[in-house]
């Protein structure tokens, strides 16, 4: 990945259906939506949201992956911070 393509970082806050944490994480990982193991991560959190997903890359690629995250059948809502 070109260093210029990493210039954008997005924090995607995800609320999922109760009890579906494992299914959601497996879904996201199996679809390859985290592409840079050094920069990107998916953390379970407590509070209004269940996961924080950090995405890095070109804005066009981040947009595409956020749309794919939202397509997960376990997602209730998302908030994205860029």
Identify the function of each model-found stretch:
Residues 1-82:
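A compositional/biophysical signature of low hydrophobicity enriched in polar/charged and small residues
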């Amino acid at each position: 990945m070109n260093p210029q393509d990493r210039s954008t970082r997005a924090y995607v806050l995800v609320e999922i259906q109760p009890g579906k944490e494992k299914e959601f994480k497996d879904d996201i990982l199996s679809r390859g939506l985290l592409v840079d193991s050094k920069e990107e991560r998916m953390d379970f959190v407590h509070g209004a949201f269940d996961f924080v997903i950090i995405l890095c890359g070109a804005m066009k690629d981040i947009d595409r992956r956020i749309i794919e995250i939202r397509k997960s059948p376990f997602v209730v809502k998302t908030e994205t911070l860029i």
